[in-house]
Amino acid sequence: MDNKELQKLTEDISETYFKKPFRHQALFNDRLKTTGGRYLLTSHNIELNRKYLIEHGREELIGIIKHELCHYHLHLEGKGYKHRDRDFRMLLQQVNAPRFCTPLKKKAENKKTYMYICTTCGQQYIKKRAMNPDRYRCGKCRGKIKRIFS
């Protein structure tokens, strides 16, 4: 699905469920990582996360579009468009839109660790960030620290 198809789908959903036209842009933003979509208050555009379409399918994307259209239409009408507002929650129920989207599967990231050892007492230090061992001393005996592996 490309941005043109997404625009058409968003316009159709707006007419079908809200009985109001969608006059702005709906597009995919591949920089979104943890959110399904967002409604931009200044431009009134809707940005959606393509990963939800790939991972969860068209139905999940339609739910996200309905959720963002709730923000869109309420904001343009001057009503409460935030998640905590009663108007927003009522409109979500009317159009059967999800309040939250299904979380994406997390990638198994191989976190790099750095191991340091004290040359005097043998105390080991495992760190997530690299450090310059010349600038630090052992907290146990004040001996010098040496990097073992990264």
UniProtKB/Swiss-Prot annotation:
Its cofactor is Zn(2+). Binds 1 zinc ion. InterPro entries: SprT-like_domain, SprT_Zn_ribbon, Uncharacterised_SprT-like. It is found in: Cytoplasm. GO terms for molecular function: zinc ion binding. Zn(2+) binds at H67, H71. One of its GO terms (biological process) is response to stress. The keyword Metal-binding applies. Belongs to the SprT family. NCBIfam families: PRK04351.1. This is Protein SprT-like. It comes from Bacillus subtilis (strain 168).
